[in-house]
Every structure is written in C-alpha cells, then in structure tokens.
Amino acid sequence: MKILVMGGTRFVGKSLVSKLLNQNHDIDIFTRGNKSNPDNTNLIKGDRNDIECIHKLKNKKYDVIFDISGREVEQTKLLIENLDDSFHRYIYVSSAGVYKDNYELPLSEESPLDTNSRHKGKFETENWLVEKKIPFTSFRPTYIYGPGNYNKIENWFFERLFHLKSIPIPADGSLITQLGHVSDLSDVMI
C-alpha cells in the first residue's frame, strides 16, 4: 500500500513507520522536523500549516493516511482539501484528553467531551471528518510511554518507580489512569 504519515519521525510516528516498513509498505513521511527519515521512506519536508508545503502532496495518491501531528481542524481541512480523494482510510491520532473528567468507566465515543480542553481541536477534527463523510478511524490514547518519548510526565512516573519513590495520587487517592506503550498503539493503528 502507498501510505502517507503526517509527522512520522518522532515517538509515535517512528514506531508506526518502523512497523509499516516491516510490512513492506511504500511510505511518504511529511514532517517539518529535523529528524532523519528511516531508510526506504520518502521524506517530504514542510509545515502542515503552510498551503505551499501542503501543495507538495497535491498530485500524490495514497491508500491510507496516518495523521499523528494534527492538532487543529484547520490543519486537517487544509490537508484533505489538497489531497487526491481516492484514499481508503484516514487514521487520526486524537487524545483521551478530549473527555471531561469522568469516574464512570470505561469511556466510549458517547462519553462527555471537555469543550475547554487543550485538545478541543482534536474532537473538532473528528466532528469535521464525520460531517464530511470521510472514511476515518480515530484513536484516543491516554499517556503513551516507550522508546523515544519526549514527554516528561511519563518519564517522571517511571523514574520514581525505578528509584523506589512514592507516586502521589491526586484527590482522595482513588483516581486511576492507564498508560499505553507506543508499540501497542502502533500495532492497533495498523
């Protein structure tokens, strides 16, 4: 398959691209970053907020698009409106941060969303994809850990475990959360 990965040279993207390459897919990576691209991929350098950069994708045909870097609905609109529309599936990495604080588990697509969340653009993107009838799958992972993680929160947690330090739990101590490994997230997305 011909695959476009938006943001494929860091953490989740790096794990995903590695697994896709193991399945012998033809991969284009669109990134603004300075990380080197993996062998056997085509790096397309550009800022997804810049229409001139997005035009580099204009005449390319993809079977699947993995969007790891999208944060705002305008970014997704710009991308999709400038792509050949023959792709079969748009796979979007959202966030569990779109949900309101909720003590009823498990969460589902119908669970209340936090319209003031810093992840508001993620659920606005999902709503736009539904409205436009674009074939998509959205993943809403929680805290992701694993090789290449650049977020301090998850590393802080494991550092405390490794050094046998206590891990403070907010409120009355009954709060639960779940961490997911980057490799598991990549597997389920494929």
Where are these regions (language model features)?
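NAD(P)-cofactor binding segment of oxidoreductase domains
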Residues: 60-106, 110, 120-128
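N-terminal Rossmann-fold cofactor-binding loop
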Residues: 30-35, 47-48
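Glycine-rich "substrate-gating" loop/helix at the edge of Rossmann-like oxidoreductase active sites
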Residues: 142-151, 171-180
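Conserved beta-loop-beta element that borders a ligand/cofactor-binding pocket
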Residues: 126-148
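N-terminal Rossmann NAD(P)H-binding glycine-rich loop of SDR-like oxidoreductase domains
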Residues: 3-23
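Short amphipathic alpha-helix with an adjacent loop that forms part of the alpha/beta core around
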Residues: 51-61
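Alpha-helical substrate-binding/gating segment
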Residues: 158-168, 175-190
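Rossmann-fold cofactor-recognition segment
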Residues: 40-50, 69-71
